[in-house]
Amino acid sequence: MLAEKLQINSITPHPSVEYWSVCKVEALFETPFLELVYRAAQIHRKHFNSRTIQLSTLMSIKTGGCPEDCGYCPQSARYHTGVQNQQLLDVNEIIAKAKIAKARGAGRFCMGAAWRGPKPKDIEKVTEIIKAVKSLGLETCGTFGLLQDGMAEDLKEAGLDYYNHNLDTAPEHYAEVIGTRRFDDRLSTLGKVRKAGLKVCCGGIVGMNETRKERAGLIASLANLDPQPESVPINQLVKVEGTPLADAEELDWTEFVRTIAVARITMPKSYVRLSAGRSGMTEEMQAMCFMAGANSIFYGDKLLVTDNPEEDGDQLLMAKLDLEPETAENKK
């Protein structure tokens, strides 16, 4: 299948890691719901403290005006979504936000820029920002798009810990969502990131009119990366008026929980992050996601330009569920 060929040609699965065919992952999705969640919960407890949640804060440091045509994204210059373009923020403004994030319990500060990919002059500014955030004692993560040769090394030298570069969706469904880049382009940048010694944050989006088999294809593609991503954000589509996917078919909540569980089973040592779309989830649905193996969230009232639950609400939910922020002391 295309997903398998792309993986083998671009990033070969490690022989010590179980290889996940699309058919094998699809079979997991077909597992009876409660049995699937139970299996995922067992695997989660084997590798992580089940009472801790890793907290990250995400900030848009350059907003809007992106030339890409991603059908889900309100930051594309091709769509009229009401997003106001904003050039790269001043380092002092970013540091002020990072200090607030740390004071509120975040251990990682993630920065996103709406570029197809950064130019060399952008990297100079971004490395300055990374150094400043790193000096606060926070882990750093960046999502800046497709990288040219040498850029990942520059980011690593500046102190970047993680690079986020999502696969978005299954290779078979990719052209239905994005036309300005190829699935292989994502794999190419991920290869550069790994070669530079950076940790990888790589996930995708569900609810973009994909089939269950295509959801399985996304998870298989992620699980077969070598090595597997340290962090796997699973996003539920946030429908934004003006984007091509504004009228996408609603995904049943159990299917999203299944996706979390399958991600946990296939990537047992990765952090599985409950990402975009969480503001539209009930507390009960989020609790099921945590039971199914999600152990990381974005903490803060914005995810780039979309809404996210407020910190007070997250603190209350964590208290109800007897969960606490992950620290070096309570990490398994």
From Swiss-Prot:
Binding-site positions, [4Fe-4S] cluster: C66, C70, C73
GO BP of this protein: biotin biosynthetic process
CDD domains assigned: Radical_SAM (cd01335)
Gene3D superfamilies: Aldolase class I
Cofactor: [4Fe-4S] cluster; [2Fe-2S] cluster
Residues noted as binding [2Fe-2S] cluster in the record, renumbered to the chain: C110, C141, C201, R273
GO molecular function list: 2 iron, 2 sulfur cluster binding; 4 iron, 4 sulfur cluster binding; biotin synthase activity; iron ion binding
EC number: 2.8.1.6
InterPro entries, alphabetized: Aldolase_TIM, BATS_dom, Biotin_synth/BioAB, Biotin_synthase, Elp3/MiaA/NifB-like_rSAM, rSAM
Cofactor comment text: Binds 1 [4Fe-4S] cluster. The cluster is coordinated with 3 cysteines and an exchangeable S-adenosyl-L-methionine. Binds 1 [2Fe-2S] cluster. The cluster is coordinated with 3 cysteines and 1 arginine.
Pfam families, per the entry: BATS (PF06968), Radical_SAM (PF04055)
Pathway: Cofactor biosynthesis; biotin biosynthesis; biotin from 7,8-diaminononanoate: step 2/2
Catalytic reaction equation(s): (4R,5S)-dethiobiotin + (sulfur carrier)-SH + 2 reduced [2Fe-2S]-[ferredoxin] + 2 S-adenosyl-L-methionine = (sulfur carrier)-H + biotin + 2 5'-deoxyadenosine + 2 L-methionine + 2 oxidized [2Fe-2S]-[ferredoxin]
Swiss-Prot/TrEMBL keywords: 2Fe-2S, 4Fe-4S, Biotin biosynthesis, Iron, Iron-sulfur, Metal-binding, S-adenosyl-L-methionine, Transferase
Domain Radical SAM core residues, every copy: 51-278
Plastid among keywords: no
SUPFAM superfamilies per the UniProt record, alphabetical: Radical SAM enzymes
Family membership noted in the UniProt record: Belongs to the radical SAM superfamily. Biotin synthase family.
Quaternary structure annotation from Swiss-Prot or TrEMBL: Homodimer.
Physiological role: Catalyzes the conversion of dethiobiotin (DTB) to biotin by the insertion of a sulfur atom into dethiobiotin via a radical-based mechanism.
Alphabetized HAMAP family for the sequence: BioB
Protein name per UniProt: Biotin synthase
